[in-house]
UniProtKB/Swiss-Prot annotation:
This is 1-deoxy-D-xylulose 5-phosphate reductoisomerase. Belongs to the DXR family. 1-deoxy-D-xylulose 5-phosphate binds at K127, S153, E154, S188, H211, S224, N229, K230, E233. Its EC number is 1.1.1.267. NADPH binds at T12, G13, S14, I15, G38, K39, N40, N126, E128, G217. Catalyzes the NADPH-dependent rearrangement and reduction of 1-deoxy-D-xylulose-5-phosphate (DXP) to 2-C-methyl-D-erythritol 4-phosphate (MEP). Keywords: Isoprene biosynthesis, Manganese, Metal-binding, NADP, Oxidoreductase. Pathway: Isoprenoid biosynthesis; isopentenyl diphosphate biosynthesis via DXP pathway; isopentenyl diphosphate from 1-deoxy-D-xylulose 5-phosphate: step 1/6. Its cofactor is Mg(2+); Mn(2+). Pfam families: DXP_redisom_C, DXP_reductoisom, DXPR_C. It comes from Haemophilus influenzae (strain PittEE). The lineage of its organism: Bacteria, Pseudomonadati, Pseudomonadota, Gammaproteobacteria, Pasteurellales. InterPro entries: DXP_reductoisomerase, DXP_reductoisomerase_C, DXP_reductoisomerase_N, DXPR_C, DXPR_C_sf, NAD(P)-bd_dom_sf.
Length: 397
């Protein structure tokens, strides 16, 4: 078997590092062909030393210059590129077999679309592609004959629990024809699922990033605490699996052992289980339709004391309700909400606003943007820019 060339968009982040771990566990199968990051020179330098990619790219031009000099000094032949255009070109590189799309935020949008338009096999971990582009993105996957495989643990669990006919029609699954009655999206509920509501005003960034089950970046940890993460996943699931609101259900599962489920019309429920480790869904997408070693500890059923399930409380998780409502309102609303949330979470981490303010800023931002039908990527970027300014203004107020 010939080695697969993997381009990792976001190699210096949490998903990127886990992807490199899977590559390291399967050196005969995969090669880190190109690594892409933002401005983290040190991490990228270490990755280049270890994995010797053909290309390394940083979005920040000055950071790329420093990286290039460091690699030359250490006689590493990796070619260093800089800027958004170079990153988009790497995402569509003719020698790339698979693209891990894991750049967080709107910055990951254009490179992911570049990979799709090149007809690549795209391992999708960038939420914004579907949250902000939805129909545009799904249509592009079809029009350019790209292959889309979901990396998010929940969407990957749903993917594994669906019949092969659905797996081959991501974005266009005829769920009811295949006997699917419900897609059940599970979430841990974050670290504050039992915290009294009156204490929410005192929640600190340190408390919010301490996720009870998963090891994740700061932004996604806060999103998990507010359940915006689940809201974004709800939006993604609707697009990925062509699901109606009636075909979706969100439940809290504190142990994070069942990663999501599919309910069928005959009464069956198929669930995907495993230890909470992102290397499992990453390895599943990289090897699909086969399996490969991920380096993950096997699930020990005797150590699982219980599996519990709780109905979400929208008073506790207003961001979840907001995301569900935003999908119903349209693509402009999900785009504005996503951008506002990005700004609000960073402001919370920087101690400019309180934990409770995050959802308020998200809602107010949507309310200040006029309903609008998105027709192309420029429309998405325009709403993103508007929402960014509105959210920043609200934070200053």
């Amino acid at each position: 078997m010939q080695k697969q060339n993997i381009v990792i968009l976001g190699s210096t982040g949490s998903i990127g590092k886990s992807t490199l771990s899977v590559i390291e566990n399967n050196p005969e199968k995969y090669h880190a062909f190109a690594l892409v990051g933002g401005k983290n020179v040190e991490t990228m330098f270490e990755q280049c030393i270890k994995f010797r990619p053909h290309f390394a790219a940083l979005d920040d031009v000055n950071a790329a210059k420093i990286l290039r000099e460091k690699l030359i000094a250490h006689h590493i032949p990796t070619e260093v590129l800089a800027g958004q255009r170079a990153i988009c070109e790497l995402a569509a590189h003719p020698d790339a077999d698979q693209i891990m799309a894991s750049i967080v935020g709107a910055a990951g949008l254009l490179p992911t679309l570049s990979a799709v338009k090149a007809g690549k096999r795209v391992l999708l971990a960038n939420k914004e592609s579907l949250v902000t582009c939805g129909q545009l993105f799904i249509d592009a996957v079809k029009n350019y004959s790209a292959k889309l495989l979901p990396v998010d643990s929940e969407h990957n669990a749903i993917f594994q629990s669906l019949p092969p006919e659905a797996q081959e029609k991501i974005g266009f699954c005829p769920l009811s024809e295949l006997g699917v009655s419900k897609i059940i999206l599970t979430g841990s509920g974050g670290p504050f699922r039992y915290t009294p509501l009156e204490q929410f005003t005192n929640i600190t960034p340190e408390q919010a990033v301490a996720h009870p089950n998963w090891s994740m970046g700061k932004k996604i940890s806060v999103d998990s605490a507010t359940m915006m993460n689940k809201g974004l996943e709800y939006i993604e699931a609707r697009w990925l699996f062509n699901a109606s609101a009636e075909e979706m259900e969100v439940i809290i599962h504190p142990q994070s052992i069942i990663h999501s489920m599919v309910r069928y019309v005959d009464g069956s429920v198929i669930a995907q289980m495993g230890n909470p480790d992102m290397r499992t869904p990453i390895a599943e997408t990289m090897a699909y339709p086969h399996r490969t070693f991920a380096g993950v500890e096997p699930l020990d059923f005797f150590k699982i004391k219980e599996l519990t399930f709780i109905e979400p409380d929208f008073n506790r998780y207003p961001n979840l309700k907001l995301a569900i409502d935003a999908f119903a309102a349209g693509q402009y609303a999900t785009t504005a909400m996503n951008t506002a949330n990005e700004i609000a979470v960073q402001a919370f981490l920087d101690r400019q606003i309180s934990f409770m303010d995050i959802a308020k800023i998200n809602l107010k931002t949507i309310e200040k943007i006029s309903p609008y039908t998105i027709q192309n990527i420029d429309d998405v970027l325009e709403i993103d820019a508007q929402a960014r300014e509105i959210a920043k203004t609200l934070i200053r107020e």
